[in-house]
């Protein structure tokens, strides 16, 4: 079971977050392939999301396999320079690696690749539940609308 929280940034070194933590990005903009249950919903994929009653402090997919995804629809073209990830609050649970995809129509997605590489970049996750920033070089200029 993987836990994942992140923030999308507009300027290196992540000085202008897009709003995953502050909720500028609304719950309706966040979807996922599956959720463990309502207490581990996609809308809980926010940095520093705190456990609150039944809410468990992170998104968790129903299945532990490579076919799980989480999507943030930004609504317009956005320059993305990095992604911050974080494990589940107050627990020793986190994603160990992930791949990033982007789209300009929400239907056709492209894997993020580093310059000169033909294979999708596998982003490593930290080995603890503290926040970790992963730069996107080159930056991504288009995301789902």
PLM region descriptions:
Residues 4, 8-75, 88, 115-117, ...:
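Disordered, acidic Ser/Thr/Pro-rich linker "stalks" and the adjacent N-terminal cap
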Residues 27, 80, 95-99:
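Exposed beta-strand and adjacent loop surfaces of beta-rich binding modules
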Residues 50-51, 83, 94:
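Alpha-helix boundary/interfacial micro-motifs
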Residues 57, 64-69, 90-145:
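Trp- and acidic/polar-enriched beta-sheet ligand-binding modules for extracellular glycan
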Residues 71-73, 82-86, 101:
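Residues within well-ordered beta-strands of beta-sheet-rich folds
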């Amino acid at each position: 079971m993987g836990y994942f929280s992140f923030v999308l940034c507009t300027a290196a070194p992540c000085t202008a977050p897009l709003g995953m933590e502050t909720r500028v990005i609304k719950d309706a903009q966040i979807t996922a392939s599956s959720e463990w249950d309502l207490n581990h919903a996609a809308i809980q994929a926010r940095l520093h999301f705190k456990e609150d009653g039944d809410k468990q402090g992170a998104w968790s997919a129903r299945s532990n396999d490579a076919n799980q995804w989480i999507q943030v629809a930004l609504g317009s073209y956005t320059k993305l320079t990095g992604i911050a990830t974080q494990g589940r609050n107050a627990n020793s649970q986190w994603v160990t690696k992930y791949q990033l995809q982007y789209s300009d129509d929400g239907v056709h997605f492209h894997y993020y690749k580093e310059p000169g590489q033909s294979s999708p970049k596998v982003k490593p996750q930290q080995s603890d539940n503290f926040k970790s920033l992963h730069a996107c070089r080159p930056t991504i200029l288009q995301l789902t609308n």
